[in-house]
Regions:
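Positively charged n-region of N-terminal signal peptides that target proteins for export
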Residues: 1-4
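Bacterial N-terminal signal peptides
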Residues: 7-14
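N-terminal pre-catalytic segment of deacetylase/amide-hydrolase enzymes
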Residues: 18-90, 244-252, 261-262, 266
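Metal-dependent polysaccharide deacetylase catalytic core of the NodB/CE4 family, i.e.
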Residues: 30, 35-43, 89-91, 99-101, ...
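Short phosphate-binding/catalytic loops that engage adenosine nucleotides
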Residues: 68, 115, 225
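His/Asp/Glu-enriched short active-site or ligand-binding loop at hydrolase and phosphoryl-transfer sites
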Residues: 121-122, 195-202, 209-257
Length: 266
């Protein structure tokens, strides 16, 4: 009888040692995209670069439905340092120029969804015409979530919204050209930093002009920037992405929310 139990125990041990339990498959690594918005309207958009608040909300609902994380450029830097993409897809929301709809329409919706966003200011125009005012910029930039996180980040869209590369021939020499670049990068940064907590570290190229140009990248670096957002349309390539050539996808009046998913493989 003892021999029977001994044989049974040995058989169980051998079986359990040989049996291979299926381990759960690791979650697929997601993709990251940057979305580029401009003016948001309360009614129907009147030109290609506008988007209605109704369609912006549809975009946000699309993010929720497909579990798309909304992150910041600083989050992107942390992901690159880690060398590993997070599970699930992510998007960085950006808004160009400085329309006052950012304060009246965009800010409340972002707060409702608890989303982060980066706003690129055309500095010369702030407080003029239909552009946002500095008081509103300050109110948005100082708003915090739990833990002191500032979800609304302000970057530079240059001082004068000039072509940074296409008009290069009008300068007499490289020194004059570099002085122009330093003003567009440096003066806009200085003025914005008078109204926000922290530093201005993200720049969006006006018209997408000059992406990858070494003089423009050098000007960004010496003026304290860590990121340049371009208008090249693709997903971000981690870990090989050059942060001075970050692609972005324009979201226009006629963009369908589900078209965003095409860049994420949805």
């Amino acid at each position: 009888m003892k021999g029977f139990y001994l044989t049974l125990i040995i058989s169980i041990l051998l079986f359990s040692g040989c049996y291979r339990y299926d381990e759960p498959e690791p979650a697929d690594e997601g993709k990251i995209i940057v979305l580029m918005y401009h003016r948001i309207t309360s009614g129907e958009a009147t030109n290609l670069y506008e988007r209605s608040i109704e369609n912006l909300k549809k975009d946000f609902e699309y993010f929720k439905k497909h579990n798309i994380n909304v992150i910041s450029f600083n989050d992107l830097a942390e992901i690159k340092v880690s060398g590993k993409m997070p599970a699930g897809n992510s998007a960085i929301l950006t808004f160009d120029d400085g329309d006052n709809s950012w304060f009246s329409l965009v800010q409340p919706l972002l707060k409702e969804y608890r989303y982060k966003a980066t706003f690129f200011l055309w500095v010369y125009m702030i407080g003029r015409n239909s552009f946002i005012g500095w008081d509103d910029v300050e109110q948005m930039s100082y708003y915090t979530l739990e833990g002191g996180v500032h979800p609304f980040i302000f970057g530079s869209h240059s001082f004068s919204h000039a072509y940074l590369n296409a008009d290069r021939s009008k300068f007499q020499d490289l020194n004059e050209y570099n002085r122009f670049l330093d003003y567009e990068f440096g003066e806009s940064k200085r003025i914005i930093e008078e109204h926000i907590p922290g530093k201005v570290e993200v720049f969006a190229l006006p018209f997408g002009d000059g992406a990858g140009d070494e003089n423009i990248i050098s000007a960004a670096e010496r003026n304290g920037y860590k990121f340049i957002r371009t208008s090249s349309q693709s997903a971000i390539d981690i870990p090989d992405q050059d942060f001075f050539q970050i692609p972005a996808i324009p979201v226009l009046d006629n963009t369908q929310s589900d078209a965003i998913g095409n860049y994420l493989g949805i």
